[in-house]
Amino acid sequence: KLTETFFSETGRSVSIENTIMPDDEMQLEALLKSLIKQNTDIIFTTGGTGIGPRDITPDVMKKLINKEIPGIMEMIRVKYGMQFPNALLSRSIAGVAGKTLLYALP
């Protein structure tokens, strides 16, 4: 909801799709591939970036990304790691797949 409000207040036209799914590598990969094939501009995912056995989001995204953008997530880890040390354990990733920007947020 926050993302939708932010973009609508900036006067941009956006279409936001929310999907809640289990920690399933094949299901996540299929969804991301479908969105990339549709030339979606930006994909944000939340969760699944930690070091637990079910945290698979960065691993799936790495298979799809053509170019990684490491600085974005490094900045987020440093900024929030000072206040929330567990943020430093995040394996968040950002990159480009075709024409689509992908961000795996904690």
Region locations from a protein language model:
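Non-catalytic beta/alpha edge segments that cap or flank active sites
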Residues: 1-106
